[in-house]
From Swiss-Prot:
Protein's organism: Clostridium acetobutylicum (strain ATCC 824 / DSM 792 / JCM 1419 / IAM 19013 / LMG 5710 / NBRC 13948 / NRRL B-527 / VKM B-1787 / 2291 / W)
Record's protein name: Argininosuccinate synthase
Keyword field: Amino-acid biosynthesis, Arginine biosynthesis, ATP-binding, Cytoplasm, Ligase, Nucleotide-binding
EC number, UniProt record: 6.3.4.5
UniProt-listed PROSITE patterns: ARGININOSUCCIN_SYN_1, ARGININOSUCCIN_SYN_2
Length: 400
């Protein structure tokens, strides 16, 4: 009986060529696993393509709701952003995909898991670290670190020689990753930072200059940091993300073009469309400013940098990540309320923020008199607050 290899399968270029390559080089039975995290693919066609490419079996795992509730909710609570711009769409999906690969490997009695990640990318680290955390005895096959195919063009040639249909051409050669949270575009002419990216590549965001000529308003109700309602309507988790993606996207919200520092040491350029995430982050951040006390708010900003880096690096199945998420759940206890945003041609403006848990008090914050705050109290506070600075200055003067 042949050994079984579980393959992380998307139907894209990298995994399209992996099935025949595995059969040619390892003489194994390939079990393809496509994890549906919201990519806009026809899953029946994905199944057909896997079988036509030589897979013995194909699993399609629909995990969109789990992706939202167990991963993206955490992203929103943290406003998790890598290096100030990247909303971690790929990074949050990888541990869930790895989890499903391990589950299928156990079900099939497979000793090997194969992925189509390139030897220069972050995903190879994310997948293999996650798999090792769940089953340290599963062996990894990583074709990009083994074969002599050294470019997208060569990969296409190999696929065509094996009769495998590929979704890209040598002219249109972007590598794309699509899920419910984002779509990324890398490779091709984007590899030269001098090249302006082409807006024709957009899949879910309307170019701002082509967006609606009238502003749109959207209100989001959060409960303990989690979005629950859009314009007063309660929606299921997946439907809510789809709704905000649509509204933000048609108003030109959510595209970033960035150069990032990869985990493996090099810099890379990508264009990311994250319409709904960009909108939800802005609304959530505004509500936090109203409802979270100063010390917790400031400490969360510091930890958010670490959390985002941890997720980017693929360290999801770790004690640190679990502990940080426990912390943010406590911080978010009072982050309940409604934020209304005005959207217009790629711009967002806060229209209103309301919460029963608001720590802002107009009576205290106004310039008028207040029973809780006497202007005269400020003098004593300033004297104490500035005391270290005064002492330091006095000591300097004594030495002159």
């Amino acid at each position: 009986m042949k050994e079984k290899v579980v393959l992380a399968y998307s139907g894209g270029l990298d995994t399209s060529v992996t099935i025949p390559w595995l059969k040619d080089n390892y003489d194994v039975e390939v079990i393809a696993v496509c994890v549906n995290v919201g990519q806009e693919d026809d899953m029946d066609k994905v199944k057909e393509k896997a079988v036509n490419s030589g897979a013995a079996k194909i699993y399609v795992e629909d995990v969109k709701e789990e992706f939202v509730t167990e991963y993206l909710y955490n992203a929103i609570k943290w406003n998790a952003t890598y290096e100030g711009k990247y909303l971690l769409g790929t990074s949050f999906a990888r541990p869930l995909i790895a989890k499903k690969l391990v589950e299928v490997a156990h079900k099939e009695g497979a000793k090997y898991i194969c992925h189509g990640c390139t030897g220069k990318g972050n995903d190879q680290v994310r997948f293999e670290t996650a798999i090792a955390a769940m089953d340290p005895y599963i062996k990894i096959i990583a074709p990009w670190r083994l074969w002599n195919i050294d470019s997208r063009e060569a990969e296409i040639d190999y696929a065509l020689s094996k009769g495998v249909e590929v979704p890209v051409t040598k002219e249109k050669i972007y590598s794309e990753d699509w899920n419910l949270w984002h779509i990324s575009h890398e490779g091709g002419d984007l590899e030269d930072p001098k090249n302006e990216h082409k807006e024709e590549m957009y899949k879910c965001v309307t170019p701002p200059e082509e967006a609606k000529d009238e502003p749109a308003y959207i209100s989001i109700y959060f409960e303990k940091g989690v979005p629950c309602k859009i314009n007063g309507e309660e929606l299921e988790p997946v439907k809510l993300i789809e709704k905000v993606n649509k509204v933000a996207g048609e108003n030109g919200i959510g595209v970033v073009d960035l150069v990032e520092n990869r985990l493996v040491g090099m810099k890379s350029r990508g264009v990311y469309e994250t319409p709904g995430g960009t909108l939800l982050y802005e609304a959530h951040a505004q509500l936090e400013r109203l409802t979270v006390d100063k010390d917790a708010y400031h400490y969360k900003q510091v930890l958010a940098l670490k959390y985002s880096e941890l997720v980017y690096d693929g360290l999801w199945f770790t004690t640190t990540r679990e502990a940080l998420d426990a912390f943010v759940d406590t911080v978010e206890e009072n982050v309940t309320g409604t934020v209304k945003l005005k959207l217009y041609k790629g711009n967002m403006k806060v229209s209103s923020v309301e919460s029963e848990n608001a720590l802002y008090d107009e009576g205290i914050s106004s310039f008028g008199a207040s029973d809780l705050y006497d202007h005269k109290d400020a003098q004593g506070f300033i004297n104490l607050f500035s005391l270290p600075s005064k002492i330091k200055a006095m000591k300097k003067l004594e030495k002159k």
